[in-house]
Amino acid sequence: MALRAQFENSNEIGVFSNLTNSYALVALGGSENFYSVFEAELGDVVPVVHTTIGGTRIIGRLTCGNRKGLLVPSSTTDNELQHLRNSLPDPVKIQRVDERLSALGNIVACNDYVALVHPDIERETEEIIADVLDVEVFRQTVAGNVLTGSYCALSNQGALVHPRTSIQEQDELSSLLQVPLVAGTINRGSDVIGAGLVVNDWCAFAGLDTTATELAVCESIFKLQDAQPSAIISNRDTLVESYT
């Protein structure tokens, strides 16, 4: 299911939220409508956590995570960290990262298996990403842009990238990520995919300006038409068990 939402008249909902297969983070403030869209779709399955990061609401750009972990910048206060620890499921690891490029959501695009990161990220940060999120890390650009998290939206089912990504680069990224990939836009022609879209394995939320065509592309590439959370999780666990 792909839905449209707006945060206080802003269509950049990826700036104010973060969505994974085991939790969703939503910025404090905003209209109740924004929360209700998330909670109606996710409330029975994963916790929807209201929070700030470093006293700001741009939590989607400052954090990155997947179903196994969450990374937050060094500006995160002790109270915020404690609130997240209390609110997220127990198996989810939470780690503060002391990284010069502190907008982690802009410099990391990840799913449960792979992370594409800014080429200049510190070695220690790369190791933390690999360890806490339990992913394979690749230093990469998307259509020549170093902000991989801003210009790419990624789930375990597929990926949507900057519209100017060449066919050759799309093939390269697709083989790295091991998921089908398409170049496109969100919010009526915006190329900043990560800021306008959050997605997991069974639902996606896009800015209110997103056209029907853009939404259809999302539903198709992320395989959201008939996706059910419980079915996906149990299928994936069965697959993982059969390979281990």
UniProtKB/Swiss-Prot annotation:
Gene Ontology CC: cytosol; nucleolus; nucleus; preribosome
Residue ranges crossing the lipid bilayer per the database entry: none
Keywords: Cytoplasm, Initiation factor, Nucleus, Phosphoprotein, Protein biosynthesis, Ribosome biogenesis
Cellular compartments annotated: Cytoplasm; Nucleus, Nucleolus
Residues with Phosphoserine modification: 174-175
Family: Belongs to the eIF-6 family.
UniProt name for this protein: Eukaryotic translation initiation factor 6
Gene this chain is encoded by: tif6
